[in-house]
From Swiss-Prot:
Protein known as: Proteasome subunit beta 2
Lineage summary: Archaea, Thermoproteota, Thermoprotei, Thermoproteales, Thermoproteaceae
Active site: T10 (nucleophile)
EC numbers, comma separated: 3.4.25.1
HAMAP family xref list: Proteasome_B_A (MF_02113_A)
PANTHER family attached to this UniProt entry: ATP-DEPENDENT PROTEASE SUBUNIT HSLV (PTHR32194:SF0), METALLOPROTEASE TLDD (PTHR32194)
Organism encoding this protein: Pyrobaculum arsenaticum (strain DSM 13514 / JCM 11321 / PZ6)
Length: 203
């Protein structure tokens, strides 16, 4: 029997009172071999919507393209932006339709619409749960303990950013297949802002 090959990634999402933060580390690994330290796992869909993912990079990119194309088509047809929940439901249907040959990716959908801020968590089969914060991937157990301790319902977007970085640093320090720095997307009523945080660990 062959050994299980672990495909590493850690992503977190936090809903703030004035927006949403999505973040993920940048390492792309296959087992304990690092393929790249510049992998992007957070994808801006439009100026009010983004997704973050943990799993196989190709599947993450495919799902991001599907959401982006459908969001743009909806906007062109209706002349208004889709809600966060409607795009999450679309993605859920697509993922469930592939349940016999699933996408190997867990997904966080985050954004802001007329109903406020939303963070939606999805497993590879498309199960859909709205939550205040979440962590996915191989470092999720390490990251979620930081989020459990630091989250509060009145958290601001900037404090949520700091908490997301802290959670991912905790995962990077202990999870051998996570690392390479951190990509973030901060979304509020003014739009989506992408940021990068470099991480240097003492070995």
């Amino acid at each position: 029997m062959g050994e299980e090959v672990q495909i590493g990634a850690t992503a977190v999402g936090i809903k703030a009172k004035d927006g949403v933060v999505l973040a993920a580390e940048k390492r792309v690994s296959y087992g304990f071999y690092t393929l790249s330290s510049a992998g992007r796992k957070v994808f801006v869909i439009d100026d009010k919507l983004a997704i973050a993912s943990a799993g196989i990079i190709a599947d993450m990119q495919s799902l991001a393209r599907i959401v982006k194309i459908n969001a743009k088509a909806y906007e062109l047809e209706t002349r208004k932006k889709p809600t966060v929940r409607s795009m999450a439901k679309l993605l859920s249907v697509i993922m469930f339709s592939r349940r016999y040959m699933p996408f190997f990716a867990e997904v966080l959908v985050g954004g802001v619409d007329e109903e406020g801020s939303h963070l939606i968590v999805m497993d590879p089969l498309g199960s859909l749960i709205e939550d205040n914060y979440a962590a996915l991937g191989t470092g999720a157990k390490l990251a979620i303990s930081v989020l459990d301790t630091g989250y509060r319902e009145d958290i601001t977007l900037q404090d949520a950013k700091k908490l997301a970085v802290k959670a991912l640093k905790a995962a990077i320090e202990r999870d051998p297949v996570s690392g390479g720095g951190i990509d973030l997307v901060l979304i509020d009523q003014t739009g989506a802002k992408e940021e990068e945080v470099k991480v240097q660990l003492l070995i």
